[in-house]
Regions:
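Aromatic-rich, lipid-facing transmembrane alpha helices and their immediate juxtamembrane interface loops
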Residues: 1-189
Length: 189
């Protein structure tokens, strides 16, 4: 029973920590701050661009790829937050610290790169690595400088770059596997 009691104490501490982060959001990261509205723009503008730019003839392929980017980027981001490697002082929704990046900016950017490489017979890996470098070495430092992203411990931008590379590789490979397995069923049933 001691193990379960210890587990309950850990969860209680985690709830207290979550409550503190929500209180921080109410005080400093609410809709009355300019940071909140920057994050809203980071969330909505890429989705609007995607709506107009996505190749509708490949919408499921590109959408599936984007979903993979979203899922794996979210996994890596949650891992980094939970391990204390980084965090987002300002958030659109307090329970989802990086929703603007995880669900919009990063997936949409990689989707548009993926679409462009498909439509122009270009090497996906080269352009995706360039985009990963832009995110890790240009966008993240900007977010740090304006206070929207914080790194802790020994984490640096190269580590973030490696995270982006992992996401872009896994997402591409899973999409490729599912695309190869796809066999359309044209029966009337």
């Amino acid at each position: 029973m001691d193990r379960l009691h210890e587990f309950d104490n850990i969860l209680y501490d985690r709830k207290e920590n979550t409550d503190s982060l929500i209180n921080y959001w109410v005080d400093y990261s609410n809709p009355l701050t300019w940071q909140f509205w920057i994050l809203i723009a980071i969330l909505l503008v890429p989705l609007i661009i995607l709506y107009f730019k996505i190749d509708r003839s490949k919408v499921f392929l590109i959408g599936f790829f984007g979903y993979n980017v979203h899922v794996f980027f979210t996994f890596i981001d949650i891992y980094g937050i939970n391990r204390g490697y980084w965090h987002y002082p300002y958030q659109v929704i307090p329970a989802l610290p990086s929703i603007s990046l995880d669900t919009s900016l990063v997936p949409v950017a990689f989707m548009l790169i993926y679409q462009w490489t498909l439509n122009n017979q270009k090497n996906y890996y080269i352009y995706a690595i360039i985009l990963a470098a832009i995110f890790a070495f240009i966008l993240k430092p900007i977010l740090v400088n304006i206070g929207l992203f914080r790194m802790y411990g020994n984490i640096n931008y190269f580590h973030l770059f490696i995270g982006y590379i992992i996401v872009l590789l896994i997402s591409k490979w899973i999409t490729w596997i599912f695309h190869k397995l796809y066999k359309p069923n044209f029966s009337a049933e």
